[in-house]
Amino acid sequence: MTELLVGTRKGLFVLEGEPGAGFSIRTRAFVGDPVDYAMRDPRTGRLFAAVTSPFWGPRIWFTDDLGEEWQSARGVALPRGGSDALKRVWVIVAGEDAGRLYAGGDPGVLFESRDDGETWELNRALWEHPTRPRWRRDSGGLSVHSIAPWPGDPQRLALAISAGGVWLTEDGGETWAHGNEGIVAGYLPEEARATAIDLCVHHLERAPRRPERLFLQFHGGVYRSDDAGRTWTDIAAGLPHDFGFPVVLDPADPNSAYVIPVTTTDRVTDGRVAVWETRDAGATWTPQDEGLPLKDAYLSVLRQSFAATGEGPSLQLYFGATSGEIFGSGDAGATWFGVAQRLPAIASVRPA
């Protein structure tokens, strides 16, 4: 049985089913409130939800049982007395040692928990980084939205910030270094590109079987790094558009990546929906669209709304749209089926 945690503008939906056999809504939570992200810690089974209440603001909630009450985590806040306010928590990721999790949000913040998500602490080194005044808010805010731990090494971490570029640490977040070399911000004046820090990275993922390899969807470009994020190569040639938001990998194949290209102007699929796949590290791309809408389909898929579970030929892929539809594949993208319709606008999809 596959569980889908679906964060929407009007609450959390938990779906259950099997590829090709249908999915149904098991339960809902935080009805009426925006749920920006939800995940289940694969180590403990604990569920987490990032909820932005119009009354209480952004919080992280957790529960060990969907049938029990959710508890509010402590410490998800910015220092008192400052001019900034916490606006959103966009992502929660399990770390590489027991009890550790990370959460990223707006305005360009990273939180860390060492007690299975019950309490959190702000990463001061990133918050107080001297380049922060040069970071820039984009249409989605100023957000830490991608967090990529290094398998087996809790000291190494890669982050993506929109719009603040790629950041790397090798000492558990005590210090941070930029990882922007090779990324070309075509939307900036040419004379500003070489020194720009405020790069609009849309999503970043690490290949778990070859952790020095990362894939990145940019604001105009799809990139690959083979040196742990220090330098990047554009691999977008062959795609119908180089603009998009999510990127997903097959854990079994470090040469794999999946993207959903959208138009630059209105940021939706251009009439037909296709997931584009590479199995040669971006040298070539192939559209995978059997079972997807191929006519008059203008979908917007946000960066956290495309995810995978499993690996290899039985890799399951799921993506949701702001129009409330979810599509899935049980065979690594070869064929697709409808999972759900008429949900509220979807912000995140995570299978467990």
Show which residues each predicted segment covers.
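Extracellular glycan-interacting surfaces
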Residues: 1-352
